[in-house]
């Protein structure tokens, strides 16, 4: 059987008329049925395409009558299910890293962060939490300790770089890209929280890093990861029937539950890995950026999700690089350097971030067939909901090309 995965086509023509809300109440409280249009028969194994295919004239439409849900086109998935075979993770080095993918020892992380913070205290950096004492939700007294804990936790839960190459598996970086691109569309249609998408990708990488999965079961891992992430993050998560439906009944409820058990056991029930969004909010607060800069930073973080080469960087590194690049592009005259305040709160120097920033810029400027075909994130951020941020002129400027070449000094 040739390598690849089946088409998973979604009808993405037109923007959803529903506004995106943090609890996705409108998408869940009204009921669980979803109006559908049966697509034309798709070819067997190939790549997971996002190209919309029009149903043949005369094809029957099966519609569940429920006006409370927006119509959604079913998507085709692979159907084979094989046993999950666990593989031990290679021993990971514990030395300190700069932008290397190796995982740090937690004790060394604590010592490095503490020493780094003490050095910057002498610079009399502004306390961005001093005015939040009256708001108990912001936990101003504990904010610094919380983010130090998140930094330690993200290191403990990092996956090895090039983890797909370290074990016998049929999964490739391109297959991962296609899967994540499709999951971005599923996430958009289900009106889920941003955290749910980032956690979904984290769960996929952590599980694949420790278990060998056949290509025929990769999509099952993907939808199960989103099922788990939804229950972890959402107030009203999609039901298991919704995930069966979105894969065109390629997997049964029993199969998703079986994979859910396997993934939870494989992850040792540790789901709370820090996300890029957690660190971006802290960085945006420290920088005092406006909504446009914050939204652009979110877009820059999200385009890294399908990229297998970006797995080597921690969420805090990607978040810091995203806000750095966002401020550089939207405010190049006043943003001449990574100031001590941002160095303090992000815990990364400008020199540390430059290689990561250049990789993000290379993703933005890439113009190959894969980037054009699998562009769900760019399409998503081209909507008015996200300020049409993916279409701004700064993302096609000479400054961006200079940054890619490392000559933006």
Swiss-Prot record:
Lineage top rank: taxon: Eukaryota
Quaternary structure and interacting proteins, as annotated: Interacts with the CDK1 protein kinase to form a serine/threonine kinase holoenzyme complex also known as maturation promoting factor (MPF). The cyclin subunit imparts substrate specificity to the complex.
Organism from which the protein derives: Arbacia punctulata
InterPro entries: Cyclin, Cyclin-like_dom, Cyclin-like_sf, Cyclin_A/B-like, Cyclin_C-dom, Cyclin_N, Cyclins_cyclin-box
PROSITE patterns: CYCLINS (PS00292)
Recorded family membership: Belongs to the cyclin family. Cyclin AB subfamily.
One Pfam family, short name: Cyclin_N
Record GO terms (molecular function): cyclin-dependent protein serine/threonine kinase regulator activity
Protein name in the entry: G2/mitotic-specific cyclin-B
SMART domains from the UniProt entry: CYCLIN, Cyclin_C
């Amino acid at each position: 059987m040739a390598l690849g995965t089946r088409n998973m086509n979604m009808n993405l023509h037109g923007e959803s008329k529903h506004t995106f809300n943090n609890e996705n109440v409108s998408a869940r409280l009204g009921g669980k049925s979803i109006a559908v249009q049966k697509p034309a028969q798709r070819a067997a194994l190939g790549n997971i395409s996002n190209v919309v295919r029009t149903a043949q004239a005369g094809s029957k439409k099966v519609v569940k009558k429920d006006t409370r849900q927006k119509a959604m086109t079913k998507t085709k998935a692979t159907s084979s299910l094989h046993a999950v075979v666990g593989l031990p993770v290679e021993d990971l080095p514990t030395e300190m890293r700069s932008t290397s993918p190796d995982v740090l020892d937690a004790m060394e992380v604590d010592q490095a962060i503490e020493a780094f913070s003490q050095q910057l205290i002498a610079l009399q950096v502004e306390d961005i939490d001093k005015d939040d004492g009256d708001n108990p939700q912001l936990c101003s007294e504990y904010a610094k300790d919380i983010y130090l804990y998140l930094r330690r936790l993200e290191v403990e839960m990092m996956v090895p770089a090039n983890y797909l190459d370290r074990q016998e598996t049929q999964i490739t970086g391109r297959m991962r890209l296609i899967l994540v691109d499709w999951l971005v569309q599923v996430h958009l249609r289900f009106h889920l929280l941003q955290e749910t998408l980032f956690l979904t990708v984290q769960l996929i990488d952590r599980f694949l890093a420790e278990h060998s999965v056949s290509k025929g079961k990769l999509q099952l891992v993907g939808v199960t990861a989103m099922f788990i992430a939804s229950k972890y993050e959402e107030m009203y998560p999609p039901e298991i029937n919704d995930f069966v439906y979105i894969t065109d009944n390629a997997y049964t409820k029993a199969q998703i539950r079986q994979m859910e058990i396997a993934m939870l056991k494989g992850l040792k029930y540790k789901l709370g890995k820090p996300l890029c969004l957690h660190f971006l909010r802290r960085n945006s607060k420290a920088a005092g950026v406006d909504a446009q800069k914050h939204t652009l930073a979110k877009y820059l973080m999200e385009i890294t999700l399908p990229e297998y080469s970006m797995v080597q960087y921690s969420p805090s590194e990607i978040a810091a690089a995203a806000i750095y690049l966002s401020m550089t592009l939207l405010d190049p005259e006043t943003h001449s350097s990574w100031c001590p305040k941002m160095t303090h709160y992000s815990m990364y120097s400008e020199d540390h971030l430059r290689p990561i920033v250049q990789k993000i810029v290379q993703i933005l400027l890439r113009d190959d067939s894969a980037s054009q075909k699998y562009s769900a994130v760019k399409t998503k951020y081209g909507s008015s909901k996200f300020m049409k941020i993916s279409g701004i002129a700064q993302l096609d400027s000479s400054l961006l090309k200079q940054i890619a070449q490392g000559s933006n000094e």
